[in-house]
């Protein structure tokens, strides 16, 4: 673990953005998530780590109701964002996903121009009143994704023609274009080379100035580099949650220590 650069920052005073209480998830008869209780702070990067199949991605998808799209999946318990129960029947999942953006494992740009990839969400949600406002929103989103300088002269080119790392940053720009408050990232660097990974990791650190960022990662080194809080999942349970530096250097639960040191996983 000596090769890890542990980022430890004071986030204790930050407000709670997301709260989960007694959350359980079932896929048919399979009990995938078991009584998860956690509070995720605002403008903080929170990493979910754990072995494959531990439930970290399943729980991540609960935070913007992506599991609603799976017929056999049912979610129990209570999840709130800014105190609002996101599973309340009055909540529109489409509007929720504008507020809680998501970036997936593999870059998935739409088969549209770079401009139209970013403009898609604002058009759907009516966030721009005219072309000038939309142009400004697209530019600001690409700037936030650290991509503007690379694409500003070819906004009409296909998004699929960009490199893998650029495509993932385009997907991040597309996510922030709907003016979300939370960004969920499910293994966002797993398909990228080391240089592109470093660019996205630097971007994640910048994004937390404006958003709550929750990232699922199999890389403990990545979790240590980018996050201030870390949650360790194992067999559907949230085993331990705390400051990233503490989780990696002085965990309380033996299962966490076993995972960090490579004895389980």
Curated annotation (Swiss-Prot):
GO terms for biological process: phosphate ion transmembrane transport. Keywords: ATP-binding, Cell inner membrane, Cell membrane, Membrane, Nucleotide-binding, Phosphate transport, Translocase, Transport. The keyword Ubl conjugation does not apply. One of its GO terms (molecular function) is ATPase-coupled phosphate ion transmembrane transporter activity. It catalyses: phosphate(out) + ATP + H2O = ADP + 2 phosphate(in) + H(+). It is an enzyme of class 7 (translocase). ATP binds at residues 50-57. It is a peripheral membrane protein. CDD domains: ABC_PstB_phosphate_transporter. The keyword tRNA processing does not apply. It is found in: Cell inner membrane. Its main location: membrane. InterPro entries: AAA+_ATPase, ABC_transporter-like_ATP-bd, ABC_transporter-like_CS, P-loop_NTPase, PstB-like. Residues 18-260 form the ABC transporter domain. Its EC number is 7.3.2.1. One of its GO terms (cellular component) is plasma membrane. Part of the ABC transporter complex PstSACB involved in phosphate import. Responsible for energy coupling to the transport system. The complex is composed of two ATP-binding proteins (PstB), two transmembrane proteins (PstC and PstA) and a solute-binding protein (PstS). Belongs to the ABC transporter superfamily. Phosphate importer (TC 3.A.1.7) family. This is Phosphate import ATP-binding protein PstB. The gene is pstB.
């Amino acid at each position: 673990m000596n090769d890890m650069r542990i980022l430890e920052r004071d986030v204790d005073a930050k407000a709670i953005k997301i709260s989960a209480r007694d959350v359980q998830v079932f896929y048919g008869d399979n009990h995938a998530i078991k009584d998860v209780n956690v509070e995720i702070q605002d403008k903080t990067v929170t990493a979910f780590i754990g072995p494959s199949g531990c439930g970290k991605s399943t729980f991540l998808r609960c935070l913007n109701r992506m599991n609603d799209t799976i017929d056999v999946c049912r979610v129990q318990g209570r999840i709130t964002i800014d105190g609002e129960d996101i599973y309340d029947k009055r909540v529109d999942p489409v509007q929720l996903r504008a507020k809680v953006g998501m970036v997936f494992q593999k870059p998935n740009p739409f088969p549209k121009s770079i401009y139209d990839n970013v403009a898609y969400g604002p058009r759907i949600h009516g966030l721009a009143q005219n072309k000038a406002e939309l142009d400004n929103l697209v530019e600001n989103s690409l700037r936030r994704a650290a991509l503007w300088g690379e694409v500003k002269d070819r906004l009409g080119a296909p998004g699929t023609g960009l490199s893998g790392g650029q495509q993932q940053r385009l997907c991040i720009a597309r996510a922030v274009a709907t003016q979300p408050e939370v960004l969920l990232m499910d293994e966002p660097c797993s398909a990228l080379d080391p240089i592109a990974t470093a660019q996205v990791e630097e971007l994640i650190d910048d994004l937390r100035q404006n958003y709550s960022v929750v990232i699922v990662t199999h890389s403990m080194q990545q979790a240590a580099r980018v996050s201030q809080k870390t949650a360790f999942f194992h067999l559907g349970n949230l085993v331990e949650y705390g400051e990233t530096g503490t989780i990696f250097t002085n965990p309380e639960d033996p299962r966490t220590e076993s995972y960090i040191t490579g004895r389980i996983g």
